[in-house]
Amino acid sequence: MLSESSSFLKGVMLGSIFCALITMLGHIRIGHGSRMHHHEHHHLQAPNKEDILKISEDERMELSKSFRVYCILLVRPKDVSLWAAVKETWTNHCDKVDFFSSENVKVFESINMETNDMWLMMRKAYKYAFDKYRDQYNWFFLARPTTFAIIENLKYFLLKKDPSQPFYLGHTVKSGDLEYVSMEGGIVLSIESMKRLNSLLSIPEKCPEQGGMIWKISEDKQLAVCLKYAGVFAENAEDSEGKDIFNTKSVGLFIKEAMTNHPNQVVEGCCSDMAVTFNGLTPNQMHVMMYGVYRLRAFGHVFNDALVFLPPNGSDND
């Protein structure tokens, strides 16, 4: 009996040491790029109204016409109902949108990535977008079909950001030493970040197709690892009051949480007035959001926004 107990304890100890070793190797692999650059995490805020009013009317008109966002939607055949919902709703406000599918789908037009691996799909979609549209768009927004995005608010947030700088924006999450932008809230890359990412896609030592790890990590973490090698780091996007504008939950869930945690300040405790994304929506909720954001109007009440972003010609502005 004593011998069996001793063998059991040895097995537990060896197992614990092995797990610890694996964990250390994982952190070394993910954090490898941190030795190349020192970076303090930033919280980037949207401009306030006073900043916009300082811009001349002619400049505002030029900005509203020239500011262009290319949208990338990663979809799978099982997402066909969500695919239909985003196609009928908010993606009409992108200056250009392409759907990248894991396989050929007859129901909707898409670009076939011929893989079900989300990281490979993301890599291929970014390469396609850069190769084809690098001279036409300065900002690239990637999202899931469960995400609802308000593109006008995204453009407003990016208004004073220079796309020739390496921006990598959204809702940031920390995992060990790695900070990354969660795909749940959508990911924004500037053209400079796209250039740097594209230069690394063919270098497996820095941006491997399979992550090069003992276990597989999510596609948004893999993207952050690759970008880190290029000196591009995750930035959390916030409004002028410090509230997150890229959200990984639905409006309904935020309101439910606010009613529990801040019963006397439900609206203030919920979400930013300039929110860009919400996630985890059903197809019906997509259409409800579209109604609330673009269609519902209070008669006689006029919004005097300093800047107007119009959707591309031929799209339904709702």
UniProtKB/Swiss-Prot annotation:
The keyword Membrane applies. Belongs to the glycosyltransferase 31 family. Beta3-Gal-T subfamily. One of its GO terms (cellular component) is membrane. It is found in: Membrane. Signal peptide: none annotated. Residues 27-318 are lumenal. Probable chaperone required for the generation of 1 O-glycan Gal-beta1-3GalNAc-alpha1-Ser/Thr (T antigen), which is a precursor for many extended O-glycans in glycoproteins. Probably acts as a specific molecular chaperone assisting the folding/stability of core 1 beta-3-galactosyltransferase (C1GALT1). Associates with core 1 beta-3-galactosyltransferase (C1GALT1), probably not with the soluble active form. The chain crosses the membrane at residues 7-26. This is C1GALT1-specific chaperone 1. The keyword Transmembrane applies. InterPro entries: C1GALT1/C1GALT1_chp1. One of its GO terms (molecular function) is glycoprotein-N-acetylgalactosamine 3-beta-galactosyltransferase activity.
